């Protein structure tokens, strides 16, 4: 089988990055790591989808500002999101002048964007390449499960999609951190069709990529301080460890998952956006979630579910 891993002779450098989050993300263990926090889930717009575009717009702008970069310095921007036709990205970055490559890789979009940006810069095809992505709890629920106004119950295996966006720029030269190598994953479908159990659906593919990296490089899990996955969460992380156990690959001692790290499951309750209806009724997933007639700056808040 052809190797899927490329080790760069001259590792490209991540020269700048920025992260934008929502209220719930700010209240988590890594809340202080965000460059900007937005308490309004609409981000001063009138729909959640437009709000998600603001996440990307803000992340790109802040990443440029932190490194004193101008738009003309960027040779290519690689971006995507979880929505149909990547509208969160295209509307979010359409005001920028740099060349754009749209990608769709669901939950691995940022990893793929960083992979492609690194290959473009390491190969001499770009001087500075940016990658950007975003997600929004409310847009993801409508896209993959049910609109919030449906009022459906969330099963124990359901994951909470982060309301956040991130951007970074990669250069052939610079200081650490470096991208020393990349592994292109393969499609692994074990037949999981439950949209409320994404951890089980993604764990086999995550394990396949991790295993392939170690097979290609001859390295072992113990060679790393941490092996970090994106959003397997509790169910997927347990399955990942079990898959490793079956093949003698110990992933239990140093595996971390961002989906588990970004929230404090002991202290944070699941919180839902609400708005005050004319009759004073408060609505959320358990009620009539009316946002279509909302105007920027009107009554919004957080509903404890």
Predicted feature residues:
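Glycine-/small-residue-rich "gating" segment that lines the acyl/pantetheine channel
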Residues: 3, 109-112, 142-178, 263-267
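Conserved "HGTGT" condensation-loop signature of ketosynthase/thiolase-family condensing enzymes
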Residues: 1-78, 82-101, 166-305
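A generic, well-ordered mixed alpha/beta core segment in the N-terminal half of proteins
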Residues: 90-142, 146-158
């Amino acid at each position: 089988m052809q190797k899927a891993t490329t080790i760069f002779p001259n590792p490209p450098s991540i020269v700048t990055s920025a992260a934008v989050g929502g209220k719930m993300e700010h209240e988590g263990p890594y809340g202080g790591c965000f460059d900007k926090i937005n308490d309004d889930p609409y981000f001063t717009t009138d729909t959640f989808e437009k709000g998600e575009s603001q996440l990307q717009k803000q992340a790109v702008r802040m990443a440029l500002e932190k490194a004193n970069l101008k738009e003309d310095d960027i040779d290519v921007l690689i971006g995507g999101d979880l929505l149909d036709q990547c509208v969160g990205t295209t509307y979010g970055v359409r005001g920028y002048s740099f060349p754009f490559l749209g990608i769709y890789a669901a939950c691995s979009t940022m990893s793929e964007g960083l992979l492609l940006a690194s290959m473009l810069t390491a190969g001499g095809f770009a001087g500075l390449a940016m990658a950007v992505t975003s997600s929004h709890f409310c847009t993801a629920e409508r896209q993959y499960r049910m609109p919030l106004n449906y009022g459906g119950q969330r099963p124990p295996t359901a994951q909470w999609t982060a309301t956040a966006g991130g951007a970074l720029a990669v250069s052939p030269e610079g200081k650490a951190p470096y991208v020393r190598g990349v592994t292109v994953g393969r499609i692994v479908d074990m037949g999981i069709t439950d949209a409320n159990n994404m951890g089980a659906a993604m764990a086999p593919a995550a394990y396949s990529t991790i295993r392939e990296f170690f097979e290609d490089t001859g390295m072992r899990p113990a060679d790393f301080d941490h092996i970090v996955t994106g959003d397997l969460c509790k169910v997927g992380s347990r399955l990942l460890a079990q898959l490793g156990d079956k093949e003698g690959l110990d992933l239990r001692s140093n595996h971390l998952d961002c989906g588990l790290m970004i929230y404090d499951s002991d202290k944070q309750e699941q919180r839902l956006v609400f708005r005050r209806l004319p009759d004073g009724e408060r609505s959320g997933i358990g009620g009539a979630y009316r946002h279509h007639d909302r105007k920027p700056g009107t009554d919004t808040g957080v509903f404890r579910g």
